Amino acid sequence: MNTVPEPSAELLARAGAVRLAAVELGQTNNGQRSRALHAMADALQERSSLIVAANVQDLERSEAEGLASALMARLKLDATKLQAAIDGVRKVASLPDPLGLRQLHRELDTDLVLERITVPLGVVGVIFEARPDAVVQIASLAIRSGNGALLKGGSEARCTNEAVMDALRAGLAREESDVSPDALALLTTREESLGLLRLDGLVDLIIPRGSNELVRFIQDNTRIPVLGHADGVCHLYVDAAADVMKATRVAVDSKTQYPAACNAIETLLVHRSIATAFLAAAVPAFQAAGVTLRGDAESQSLGVNESAQEEDWSTEYLDLTLSVRVVDDLACATEHIRRYGSRHTEVILTEDLATADRFLAAVDSAGVYHNCSSRFADGFRYGFGAEVGISTQTLPPRGPVGLEGLVTYRYRLRGNGHIAADYAAGRRSFTHQDLPL
């Protein structure tokens, strides 16, 4: 961690303020946090024109600087996208309270009762690129789950991020809110984002949302636990028993509905026995949607124009480019996914339920789907209200991370003068009786 400087005195002070506010926030009740979220949504609504105008500034500057088209798509926050984010805040406010849930209730002995209760993590630090709507999502989930948040967005979204954060903090400052605005803070410089990595003791979890390089750098340069994913190299496998028309429709949606998203497919795998019929329908459909296809020799003989190179199989294009490969069978498809995939989201299209079940069991990704678009890998679409990120790690939380990924638990033990010596000496014995939750 020699490349990461010590945090500045100013950053330490800001992080300390967030920590103190988070302690108070963690003691609020469900109604208080819900009212605070509605106040945040109201403030965003009232300032929506200012936020959209700030986003136009960011878009114009980024276009002039030659920002990649995939990042430009993520950067855009128009009125429709902003309204969806505001609606998401209200949705989060209506979700069941994630705090204070009793997960375990056990009598260890008479008048000695153990409970396991859900509690906030404390303070989360989130580093993300280009996505200003992520500020809204993350802030709302943090407040709902009783956590403070330090957020660092990409410099390309600076004006938008500041306008959004100003609105969120203004909402928390309203009379109807019992949550301190200090629970949320926006970091704006590279020095602050590097300093964030050294805030162990003040920050409990770091969530990176961005490129593989960003995630790897953070994982290698902090002692704070990191939750996140790097690449989203998602696959769609068209089985021999697929319905061609259904498969074409789902495959096109999985690529083109929002190609800059991490849950868009990057590689299409097609069973050899259906390749001729499927590609005859799919290639024109993809071409009509503006998708560039890069394939192996067999798929090129069936209409794919460009040749795929070895690096294409492991590339997250985040654009209208798709790799295509013809495979012998399900085993070849799953082996390809194991070798090149990023354990994000994989899809099988088939009318054979037994084959689908084998795929769902064999593929070790955060999401495995049967006969539906990969684009459903999203916290809002899962009914989480929003997501703080997507985790491709094996340990939980995994996949789209909503409120459940921002809470931990605490053991509470209530006794009446009980001492361990009595049990060690055999004067008392444990009953270990589970009680109703």
Curated annotation (Swiss-Prot):
InterPro entries (alphabetical): Ald_DH/histidinol_DH (IPR016161), Ald_DH_C (IPR016163), Ald_DH_N (IPR016162), Aldehyde_DH_dom (IPR015590), G-glutamylP_reductase_CS (IPR020593), Glu-5-SA_DH (IPR012134), GPR_dom (IPR000965)
E.C. no: 1.2.1.41
Signal peptide: none
Gene Ontology CC terms: cytoplasm
Keyword Cytoplasm listed: yes
Catalysed reactions, as listed in the record: L-glutamate 5-semialdehyde + phosphate + NADP(+) = L-glutamyl 5-phosphate + NADPH + H(+)
GO MF term (any one): glutamate-5-semialdehyde dehydrogenase activity
One Pfam family named in its UniProt record: Aldedh
Keyword Nucleotide-binding among record annotations: no
Gene3D superfamilies: Aldehyde Dehydrogenase, Chain A, domain 1 (3.40.605.10), Aldehyde Dehydrogenase, Chain A, domain 2 (3.40.309.10)
Localization terms from the record: Cytoplasm
Protein family according to the UniProt entry: Belongs to the gamma-glutamyl phosphate reductase family.
Stated role: Catalyzes the NADPH-dependent reduction of L-glutamate 5-phosphate into L-glutamate 5-semialdehyde and phosphate. The product spontaneously undergoes cyclization to form 1-pyrroline-5-carboxylate.
Name of protein: Gamma-glutamyl phosphate reductase
Organism of origin: Synechococcus sp. (strain CC9902)
Higher taxonomy: Bacteria, Bacillati, Cyanobacteriota, Cyanophyceae, Synechococcales
Gene it is expressed from: proA
